[in-house]
Amino acid sequence: MMSDFSEELTKLAGAEDNPETSEFSKTRMHFPWLQKHIEAVVTGGKKRKDFAQTTSACLSFLQEALLKHQWCRAAEYMHSYLQTLEDSDTYRKQAAPEIIWKLGSEILFYHPKSNVETFSSFADRMKNIGVLNYLKISLQHALYLLHHGMLEDANRNLSEAETWRYGEKSASQEVLIKLVQAYKGLLQHYSWSKKKMELSELDEDDYAYTAKSRNMLSQSSKTSTNICTLIKTPGVWDPFVKSYVEMLEFYGDQDGARELLTNYAYDEKFPSNPNAHVYLYEFLKREKAPRAKLISVLKILHEIVPSHSLMLEFHTLLRKSETEEHRKLGLAVLFEVLDFSGCTKNITAWKYLAKYLKQTLMESHREWVEEEWKSRRNWWPAFHFSFFWAKSDWKADAELACEKAFVAGILLGKGCRYFRYILKQDHETLKKKIKRMKKSVKKYTIVNPGVHT
């Protein structure tokens, strides 16, 4: 059944760049002990046991080759592993098609000698062998075609999958069919977006504008039908939600877009998803929603991902709030952003913290600063303010080093090694800033005089 593909794999297995020197360059097997055992497919006795052990070993070698990105070697192992489709063990025989598809598609995606025809041929054969995996394979095949810019072929593939049925429809089949339909919707959205771009270049009084508008409306109706069912099912459907919201907004259905995004973010049936809150926030921002509403959305995002890039925007909203609780949270948000290693070089975060520390202390809220510092005093000095980081930061970005030095001085006192190192540096442009920083640290530091760190 897989003989044609097996031959193709054999060719791929020998497709090294240097066929004369590569140990995997020939079209024959190079593992005689493996070939001998695998070809001994019988129904009982020692050989049956040997077959199971050998195919298991073959799978391990195959996985190892994939992990090392040895695509030609993996193709050769796959050529052998195909024999497991004839395994006498029912469970292994049923599991084989899915394993072969997952590993085989990975090989064909990356193999230097593979092409669309080879991949498609493999996908079509696997659909017929692993009927229970038909929808998954069809969907992944369509995504592969999309990756290669073959939109019409991908759409045709999805249309065939949409009408496919096998036995009684299970719950998992139902979700996969919805997913197939939704991806069709994404393709339709792509066509709709292109028409939208073309429409923006036409005069509204032009006949072509009216005709294209009607065409777009028809396209959006199809897209809605295909996407709607899926996004009502609990799950993470970011690209589908974004596409649908874009169309709702374009046609002026703000209420529909708001309801969809609110449900996507807050419905307890859906898994926790930071992006759902991001999309809702961005929509409300476009609507010019009140600050309190924006804060309430970002507050939940902050609880899920305290290092999210929107946290600096969240801080700005909190800082401008008239509520003391919000302004206090604004300080905590900055500290929490800088708790993460990926944010240590974020100069905007350090600028915001330096400025807000000074403002907070000027407004006599020293206890806010001390509360945040209490849980960090044992690890932030080494994490942010060591002598090593002082030299490294100054060399890489003097402006960043100045902002950090001010924060270090406020939190650790003027005896802090980071602060002292930056203070001694000679920089024509930053000379005045460093002088002002020295005065501010002396005035606002939360450390008692004489304490050195």
UniProtKB/Swiss-Prot annotation:
Spans annotated as Disordered: 1-22
Taxonomy, superkingdom: Eukaryota
Major localisation: nucleus
One of the GO BP terms on file: transcription by RNA polymerase I
Swiss-Prot/TrEMBL keywords: DNA-binding, Nucleus, Transcription, Transcription regulation
Gene Ontology terms, MF aspect: DNA binding
UniProt key word DNA-binding: yes
One GO cellular component, as annotated: nucleoplasm
Keyword Cell cycle carried by entry: no
Membrane-traversing stretches: none
Localisation: Nucleus, Nucleolus
Database matches in InterPro entries: RNA_pol_I_TAF1A/TAFI48_chr, SL1/TIF-IB_Component, TAF1A
The protein's role, per its UniProt record: Component of the transcription factor SL1/TIF-IB complex, which is involved in the assembly of the PIC (pre-initiation complex) during RNA polymerase I-dependent transcription. The rate of PIC formation probably is primarily dependent on the rate of association of SL1/TIF-IB with the rDNA promoter. SL1/TIF-IB is involved in stabilization of nucleolar transcription factor 1/UBTF on rDNA. Formation of SL1/TIF-IB excludes the association of TBP with TFIID subunits.
Subunit structure: Component of the transcription factor SL1/TIF-IB complex, composed of TBP and at least TAF1A, TAF1B, TAF1C and TAF1D. In the complex interacts directly with TBP, TAF1A and TAF1B. Interaction of the SL1/TIF-IB subunits with TBP excludes interaction of TBP with the transcription factor IID (TFIID) subunits. Interacts with UBFT. Interacts with CEBPA (isoform 1 and isoform 4). Part of Pol I pre-initiation complex (PIC), in which Pol I core assembles with RRN3 and promoter-bound UTBF and SL1/TIF-IB complex.
Name of this chain's protein: TATA box-binding protein-associated factor RNA polymerase I subunit A
Protein's organism: Rattus norvegicus (Rat)
